[in-house]
């Protein structure tokens, strides 16, 4: 399972840009998606993964956004996640064979600020509700991937997306779904004060599960609740960026980007 990117949804992209400036995380402008309802910026990392900051275009109601309207309207932060695959049709068939509903493959695209159009194919997989984003969506580029993302100038002390933390109603139930779809190993509980609920890490996979409350589930459903960026030197990362004091994440340590937009949603793990 190779994380391509994590989408971070908000109702105003200018607010996210300002927060990125405050914490010192550089970003590139990405342009508007081809349906015209959302636009984005992104931070590309050395391992090829990236964070996508997505919001409604000016004049578009968040509820009318073509991507993840509930997350954008609710300022959920992490809204969905994506994995890179070699064959989106074959990956779609695997989801169907495992008994899950799919939407796709779908042709997607966006127009960069320099006028270049980026194109890809993706499939959205549903678990048990139309607004469920528990599973990642697979993606394959039609245009060169370097058109879609490249490493952002100024990124330092970060390797890329390390862990996608998924907010779920029940740890065992979610683990069973991932076993059925991806044949992952059994999640292992870890000790941490970084999030409110119980947390279980999946050995060898870039995911962790945490139980979230009914109010969040009612608002945005099961989907990513946080994303942790990898570093091999947390002290260097804390020098480069405005981060909170670190806390335990099992045997590792995690610190959040210290801004209301990102705290508890985007962090760095060593």
Name every feature range the model reports, one short phrase each.
Residues 36-48:
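N-terminal low-complexity or amphipathic/hydrophobic leaders
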Residues 1-3, 8-28, 45-270:
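Glyoxalase I/VOC metalloenzyme domain signal
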Residues 29-34:
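Conserved catalytic-core motifs of GNAT/GCN5-like acyltransferases
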């Amino acid at each position: 399972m190779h994380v391509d990117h994590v989408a971070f949804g908000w109702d105003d992209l200018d607010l996210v840009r300002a927060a990125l400036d405050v914490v010192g995380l550089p970003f590139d402008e990405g342009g508007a998606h081809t349906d015209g309802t959302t636009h984005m910026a992104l931070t590309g990392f050395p391992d090829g993964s990236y964070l996508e900051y997505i919001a409604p275009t000016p004049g578009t109601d968040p509820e009318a956004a073509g991507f993840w309207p509930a997350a954008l309207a609710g300022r959920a932060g992490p809204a969905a996640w994506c994995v890179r695959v070699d064959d989106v049709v074959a990956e779609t068939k695997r989801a169907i064979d495992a008994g899950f509903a799919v939407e796709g493959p779908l042709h997607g695209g966006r127009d960069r600020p320099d006028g270049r159009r980026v194109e890809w194919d993706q499939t959205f997989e549903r678990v048990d509700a139309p607004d469920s984003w528990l599973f990642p969506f697979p993606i394959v580029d039609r245009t060169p991937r370097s058109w879609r993302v490249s490493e952002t100038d100024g990124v330092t002390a970060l390797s890329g997306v390390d862990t996608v933390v998924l907010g779920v109603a029940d740890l065992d139930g979610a683990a069973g779904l991932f076993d059925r779809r991806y044949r992952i190993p059994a999640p292992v509980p870890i000790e941490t004060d970084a999030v409110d609920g119980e947390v279980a890490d999946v050995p060898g996979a870039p995911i962790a599960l945490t139980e979230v409350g009914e109010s969040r589930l009612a608002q945005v459903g099961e989907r990513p609740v946080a994303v942790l960026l990898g570093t091999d030197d947390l002290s260097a990362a804390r020098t480069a960026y405005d981060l909170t004091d670190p806390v335990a994440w099992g045997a590792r340590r995690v610190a959040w980007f210290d801004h209301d937009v990102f705290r508890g949603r985007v962090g760095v793990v060593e």
